[in-house]
Amino acid sequence: MGLLTGKTALITGAARGIGKAIALKFASEGANVAFTDLFIDEEHGGLATEREIAALGVKAKGYASNAADFAQTADVVAKVKEEFGSVDILVNNAGITKDGLMLRMTEQQWDAVIAVNLKSAFNFIHACVPVMMRQCKGSIINMASVVGVHGNAGQSNYAASKAGLIALAKSVAQEMGPKGIRANAIAPGFIDTAMTQALSEEVRKEWASKIPLRRGGTTEDIANTALYLASDLSSYVSGQVIQVDGGMNM
């Protein structure tokens, strides 16, 4: 029996990348998986991800949704509850970057990143918590970043959104703990994804030189951490931030 057998996980921004890795990991441990992305089609990978999850013998469905839209989020969560029966695990993974130095950053760049990265998490937590309260149990995982812990020049919007996700997880942990709901955050470091693969080899080597393990992490590293926080292995863990960064930040 898998660690998540009989549970339903809802993961945002999971058509590819870290979100997809988490979805597949959860499914391999027996969870039924509902996931969202801006598009669920062949072009953007959503339908392929849905098929890969289902091939592991669990129920899987992708929902096209703008996670930053409060009304759309409420509608998605209602559909997941109706079609899956419960929401036991919520992973707030949806995120974007629109980098720029402070004096060159536009209001649109700031607002877009805060909306997708931070407001979306509020939207989904707000919609899922009533379901979890009725179940007297639930695990909420916010995908933050080491940038949210230490900041990063040229990423003030992204850093602020990720720091907000950490504070949001801690606040929800305090507020919802008496209801049996746990909330934690994962702060990945330099992870090998399509986003980081687009960087030059020189930049990638410079990053690796700053990491004690001398390499970037993998999406599997993050998925394994998410599995721990989603499962009963972490039943007494709440309000925490786990940095998965190869020792980059100590």
Residue spans for each PLM region:
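Active-site helix of classical SDR
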Residues: 125, 161, 169
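Residue(s) in the substrate-gating loop at a strand-loop-helix junction
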Residues: 145
